[in-house]
Amino acid sequence: IAEKYPQGCFDMIFADPPYFLSNGGITCQSGRVASVNKGGWDKSQGIEKNHAFNTEWLKLCQQVLKPNGTIWVTGTMHVIYSIGFAMQQLGFKMLNDIIWEKPNPPPNLACRYFTHSTEIVLWAAQSIKSKHCFNYEAMKNQNDGKQMKSVWRIKPPGANEKFFGKHPTQKPIELLKRCIEASTNEGD
């Protein structure tokens, strides 16, 4: 897709890459046992190959970002550390790690670890030299006049948000709206 666009054309990118979790496991969705297999695209090829994949798609994103553009990337503990490391290797300027807290996560069926109730959203600028956009006052206004913190409590998307089918890891509109409002200006 990146080849269709000229270099430096986007002010912001929101990426939801594979989490590499399709491993034959199960979860609970709407009170029913469900497979976690999303498809071959989400199956791990091993740590090194997964990291190479993350580095490659991030390179493409970096090329199409404007010099002052930013990227938001979501992930769980299974993939986000590789992504953050790849971003640092590529020279992105790390701005924040947002913790998206889900108030109603699926239950922990294995009972061998804490319930996964968060995802991490990394926010980074195109390079160390970037003078990125941050709409500080707008974020403060959304938080009753207080500075917006890096823990965001947002419900996962409901059925009313799933207009175009059922993407297995669809993000809530409120999450994307906040990212867009924080890091872009009207008309971008």
Question: Where do the language-model regions lie?
Answer:
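Core catalytic lobe of class I
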Residues: 1-188
